[in-house]
């Protein structure tokens, strides 16, 4: 029987080959241990090299955001359900900062602040992401606001106009029509090459559903993204929602497009941030808000801009909402946001309940930029309208005490009452700017002075219908639409006189 001989050289060659082919894959990760969890906040030991604002991952796959870097532990806000996280769990660094998906695929969808769809219409196919915290455009990258953003609401376009790239605060008590103003503005952007983003912060889910259905009904969802962090969601998501919305908008702005972002509302974001800060044991300041609550809103609203031509001439317009308590606009968050924005529209509950809708207080509302963006025709017809209306409100209060008023005062009161009627507008009935100009022209040139106040709304409706049918009326409207300026005033006056002859005053 032959004995098999084993050569030492062969064995050593084989071992050598195995050693050469051996690959050791060592994965180094920075891992910490959860030492405390509750109320959407976790504290972790370890994670020595974690950065402020970095994403971390818990053992059950839930993500968190490192906000507090302390001597012995890290304060983490949990971006999701925290019930599955317990003391002793592992938490690891990801090396990434918070990002959201961006792109055309988001248009027409309802997403949460992490960019995940919540409308049941399947996954969203996006290829790009952007960090939610990014620097605002610099001084030299901006341009003065000069293009109008037509809201379709007479009281806003005439009294407190908004330009593309502006930040206009909408402030008022609850139930004064703030959301309606935003929804009507979004509906009016149809066909104007505008992307709209509606950010619902701490709203009831039924309210968000109603807004989405309204936008769908008027065909506005075709150019709108809805970002929602409802009242039932954890505070971190409410805090992040506005940043997610503006990040999605910036993608389009830097591509040279025009974007409108509505934040409904920032009071709830500030309250969510206060909750997080107190749970993280940061020192409280005025009204228990943390010291950096101003920076919370300023870094968000500074990202709204009109970009220079060199940067693509895109724009991002912000309409932040702030809810007041009993009309107190001198509270902490309202004064903060007023100082950051380029003007405010103050909606007053007294006006709302007396039937003046939209309930805009002309005296306290102002636009610090938009006048430069008004079309020439609107600027000519609405020049002193805001001041006249504010003066009328003062006279109205004074007139209740005086019985014998001089003729000039009576004329002012009569014109003021008609102005209030003209500026009233139904829900979801935005008007094209040329029709707004037509009725305000008729008002300011005295054509409505002999029409009874109760007939003004009907006069306006029939006048607009007449302008659509009449050949001369169509030409006048086309002139305003194409040139942005008033047509020949004599022709305009003749057209209004011609319509007035056909209008029947009610008995």
Swiss-Prot record:
Q: What is its EC number?
A: 7.1.2.2
Listed GO cellular component terms? plasma membrane; proton-transporting ATP synthase complex
Gene3D superfamilies, sorted: 2.40.30.20, ATP synthase alpha/beta chain, C-terminal domain, P-loop containing nucleotide triphosphate hydrolases
Keywords assigned: ATP synthesis, ATP-binding, Cell membrane, CF(1), Hydrogen ion transport, Ion transport, Membrane, Nucleotide-binding, Translocase, Transport
Q: What class of enzyme is it?
A: translocase
Chemical reaction(s) catalysed: ATP + H2O + 4 H(+)(in) = ADP + phosphate + 5 H(+)(out)
Which terms does the record give in the GO molecular function aspect? ADP binding; ATP binding; proton-transporting ATP synthase activity, rotational mechanism
> Where is ATP bound in this sequence?
172-179
UniProt region (Disordered), positions on chain: 118-141
Q: How is this protein positioned relative to the membrane? A: Peripheral membrane protein
Compartments, record wording: Cell membrane
- According to UniProt, residues marked as the site described as Required for activity are 365
Give the similarity note. Answer: Belongs to the ATPase alpha/beta chains family.
What quaternary structure, including any partners, is listed in this protein's UniProt entry? F-type ATPases have 2 components, CF(1) - the catalytic core - and CF(0) - the membrane proton channel. CF(1) has five subunits: alpha(3), beta(3), gamma(1), delta(1), epsilon(1). CF(0) has three main subunits: a(1), b(2) and c(9-12). The alpha and beta chains form an alternating ring which encloses part of the gamma chain. CF(1) is attached to CF(0) by a central stalk formed by the gamma and epsilon chains, while a peripheral stalk is formed by the delta and b chains.
Report the PANTHER family cross-referenced here.
Answer: ATP SYNTHASE SUBUNIT ALPHA, MITOCHONDRIAL (PTHR48082:SF2)
Q: What does this protein do?
A: Produces ATP from ADP in the presence of a proton gradient across the membrane. The alpha chain is a regulatory subunit.
Protein name, UniProt field: ATP synthase subunit alpha
Coding gene?
atpA
